């Protein structure tokens, strides 16, 4: 060892005369990158800590300010002799004391303030109108409190509902009432009313119904415009915004008409904007793909079975009083849209997931009285309603179970007069009317009947007939006729289908189509079936 020769235990220093470094360049570069990354992360940590501390300080400061305004409100509220300026200051304190976390205490403050404001006689007219902006801000906070305050007292909620209704009363001009109604609609008025109806006892919901329908009086002009959004960026008309939120939040309530008193049900029936709602539901259906089941619109209300049940409760009683074929078409297309948007398990008693009360409402759609009314009303406007009727029938036949389909098909084999009583006519008159009045001369029939020398041309024509959306209406007519005529053939005897020459000529034949018409129809079906077999790539040879 070294110290045995030198007498020292200190290790000798290493002398590197060649100039070699102890670490390679790659290691030094890696160390530099590591140090740089550590400095960057430290800077990010410092920046994040600064933001967090700033946010906390802002939260603490705003909370202290809210507490200050709340204390000021409580102090001013103790004074029973309030001047108009005191009311203005109270309103400002009430607005500034509002928090994003709703509390029952602040909701109680707003309810007490609302009770006194609605009944205050010391407010002169100019000063009352000068506080409109503050009142709108209070209204927005009340709507928020009605939606999200847990265990809100019914008395406090009713006081806020009355204040929101007072803002749309005759205390203001018509223009001011409309501005208040539009402001509240954009900030979730119907969503707040929905929460109140769900939690209030039945006898306390009368004001809720009156408030939900008040915009109909302020915006009386019917509209066909569709509002996709309800926020401040919405550029649609006020009535379309009302219809959008009314359908989404009110008509989707479970057992709506069992949750409100009889007087409110009468108000619903008299004020119900059926035409606007029918057009709106069809617009909602345009955002839903029946084949794939995809919906472009978020939270599409047509997928709620309660919407179908609530609409049927009122609309089914108006079908006999409709005075135009356009209204009947809208009604039938609305029912088709709502049925297509629901799973088929909804309509089957054995697989349904809806409650018995809602199922009973939905069953009104296929009741004998409703079907008779639909057929009779469609007969009154046969020249314009048959395509919509077939759309409704196809949707109903596809949605409901087999037992309902059989009953419906039997009803379709017989015609109804304008009063809904059975006519003494030949069986299957609807088949004859559809074939001779609509299908025989349609573009779809001409497309399917093309006979070219080249078989490929026939295939191209049939493919176009099957895939072109321009023939959608013709297809519903054609399918309805084939389904009803197929059931007609089941119940006809041989002598009724092809009567003998010796039979009485005065007795009408029960076969709705002549032999020549049947030959043409058979040719169309043959071409259709052949193309479907030819074009199906996945079909095996055995099938």
Outline where the language-model segments fall.
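Context-dependent free N-terminus signature
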Residues: 2-4
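Calmodulin-binding IQ motif alpha-helix
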Residues: 11-87
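Eukaryotic non-catalytic interaction scaffolds in large regulatory proteins
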Residues: 80-543
């Amino acid at each position: 060892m070294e110290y045995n020769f030198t007498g020292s235990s200190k290790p000798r220093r290493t002398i590197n005369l060649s100039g070699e470094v102890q670490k390679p360049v790659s290691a030094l570069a890696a160390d530099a990158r590591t140090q740089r990354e550590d400095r960057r992360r430290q800077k990010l940590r410092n920046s994040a800590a600064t933001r967090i501390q700033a946010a906390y300080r802002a939260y603490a400061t705003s909370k202290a300010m809210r507490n200050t305004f709340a204390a000021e409100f409580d102090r001013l509220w103790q004074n029973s002799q309030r001047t108009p300026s005191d009311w203005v200051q109270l309103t400002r304190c009430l607005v500034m004391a509002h928090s994003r976390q709703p509390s029952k205490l602040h909701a109680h403050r707003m309810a007490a303030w609302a009770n006194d404001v609605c009944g205050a006689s010391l407010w002169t007219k100019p000063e009352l109108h000068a506080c409109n902006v503050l009142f709108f801000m209070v209204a927005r906070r009340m709507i928020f409190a009605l939606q999200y305050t847990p265990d809100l007292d019914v008395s406090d909620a009713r006081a806020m509902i009355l204040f929101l209704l007072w803002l749309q009363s005759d205390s203001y001009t018509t223009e001011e009432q409309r501005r208040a109604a539009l402001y509240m609609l954009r900030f979730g008025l119907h969503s707040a009313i929905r929460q109140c109806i769900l939690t209030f006892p039945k006898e306390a919901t009368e004001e809720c119904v009156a408030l939900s329908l008040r915009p109909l009086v302020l915006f009386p002009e019917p509209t066909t415009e569709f509002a996709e959004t309800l926020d401040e960026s919405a550029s649609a008309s006020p009535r379309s915004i009302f219809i959008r939120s009314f359908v989404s939040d009110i008509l989707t309530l479970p057992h709506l008409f069992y949750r409100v008193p009889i007087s409110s049900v009468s108000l619903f029936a008299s004020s119900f904007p059926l035409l606007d709602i029918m057009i709106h539901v069809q617009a909602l259906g345009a955002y839903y793909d029946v084949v794939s089941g995809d919906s472009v619109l978020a939270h599409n209300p047509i997928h709620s079975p309660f919407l179908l049940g609530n609409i049927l409760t009122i609309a089914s009683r108006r079908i006999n009083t409709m005075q135009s074929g356009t209204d009947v078409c809208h009604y039938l297309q609305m029912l088709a849209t709502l049925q297509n948007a629901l799973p088929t398990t909804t309509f089957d008693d054995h697989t349904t997931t809806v409650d018995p009360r809602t199922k009973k409402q939905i069953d009104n759609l296929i009741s004998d009285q409703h079907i008779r009314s639909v057929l009779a009303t469609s007969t009154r406007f046969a020249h314009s309603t048959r395509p919509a009727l077939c759309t409704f029938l196809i949707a109903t036949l596809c949605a409901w179970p087999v037992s309902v389909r059989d009953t419906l098909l039997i009803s379709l084999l017989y015609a109804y007069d304008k009063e809904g009583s059975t006519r003494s006519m030949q069986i299957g008159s609807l088949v004859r009317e559809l074939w001779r009045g609509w299908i025989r001369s349609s573009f779809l029939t001409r497309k399917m009947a093309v006979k070219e020398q080249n078989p490929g041309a026939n295939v191209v024509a049939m493919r176009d007939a099957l895939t072109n959306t321009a023939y959608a209406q013709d297809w519903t007519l054609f399918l309805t006729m084939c389904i009803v005529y197929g059931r007609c053939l089941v119940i006809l005897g041989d002598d009724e289908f092809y009567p003998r020459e010796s039979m009485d000529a005065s007795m009408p034949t029960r076969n709705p189509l002549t032999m020549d018409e049947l030959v043409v129809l058979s040719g169309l079906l043959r071409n259709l079936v052949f193309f479907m077999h030819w074009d199906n790539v996945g079909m095996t040879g055995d099938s």
